[in-house]
Amino acid sequence: MTEKDSNVEESVLEVEQASQVELDSEQISPAEKESVLAEEKEFSTDVDIPEMTAPDDEKSAFFEQWKARHQAYLAHKDEADIQAVDEGQTEQEIPEAKKSKRVLFQGIERKTESLKSKKETGEKVQTLKVDIPSKVVWKAIPVLVTSLLLAALALYFISPTSKKKQIEVVGNERLTAEQVENYSLISPDDYNVTIALHADAYAKNIKKNSSSVETATIKFQFPATFTIHIKEYAIIGYIQQQSQWYPVLSSGEIGGEPISQDSLPEDYTTINLSDKELIKELAIELGKIDAGIRSAIQTINLPPSKVTADLLTFNMRDGNTVLVPLSEISQKVSYYTKIAAEVTVPTTIDMEVGIYRYAS
């Protein structure tokens, strides 16, 4: 063997050793390592080095030609492998026989490409994070607040809480709280918001449905309490109709519900009048005087009189008698307390023309 032949063998050994070093440096499985070594061995052993019997100069020329062609062939294969990797071909698409030792570095190249693609993707995501202008945010706040309020109202009206209520009645003397509530026409199915917004209308229902109520107001306390304040007309006396007693209110109206004699109060005033217009006028006039004087009247009669058609006779509980025209009750009867304190025997106090008294 010549010196050039030994150099060829040494170059082949160096290639194999380089391949072995690359395999050891890569973290691949033993099976893959054996496969790559077999391929390179096949490439290295498939090329037979011809034995030459020609002179040394001819052998050197032939060897140089063979070496140049072999290096060109290897360079061509390397370029083909690199192009296949760039075009995204997988290892399965490349025949096992055409793989070279450069396949060992494709994993590193792919990892590098993956890192580059992730970096580019991250940069794209960062570029998409655009700051929203403050003007847009301030314009969106009213819309969001309105939407939230509407949603809250919708949930409130759907829930049973919107109809759950507590009703209290204040100022009632003869009427019960249940009666006042029924007169208001407030229904359990009515929304609390509806009652609060139309409180005046419900209060008018009480006055309309009950002649005993003088004033009525409804006040709302959060969250669901309604207080009904009423003032009842004073009862100035009672009239008897067909063995039934009816209260006469200070408004001039006659109560609609009859009362038995056993249910009458101890100090009640009996009104012996039949004309409804006179009864109404009498009730209005008596409603203007002091309640103490009004409670001191036992009976009210209308005796016939040629001089004064509306002259009334008041029989007082202390035994005195008062004569007074119906149209002047609120003006003259207020003096009765002072006059009654001055007499010691039953006395008739005549207020028809002026005011004077004489013993009964």
Swiss-Prot record:
Q: Could you tell me which Pfam families the record lists for this protein?
A: FtsQ_DivIB_C, POTRA_1
Q: In which residue ranges is the amino acid composition biased (Basic and acidic residues)? A: 31-44
Could you list which ranges are Extracellular topological domains? 161-360
TM ranges are 140-160
**InterPro entries from the entry?**
Cell_div_FtsQ/DivIB_C, DivIB, FtsQ_DivIB, POTRA, POTRA_FtsQ_type
Q: Where is this region: Disordered?
A: 1-54
Polar residues compositional bias: what residue ranges? 17-28
Identify the main location: membrane
Residue intervals annotated with topology Cytoplasmic: 1-139
> Listed GO cellular component terms?
cell division site; plasma membrane
User: What job does the chain carry out?
Assistant: Cell division protein that may be involved in stabilizing or promoting the assembly of the division complex.
Family statement: Belongs to the FtsQ/DivIB family. DivIB subfamily.
What name does UniProt use for this protein?
Cell division protein DivIB
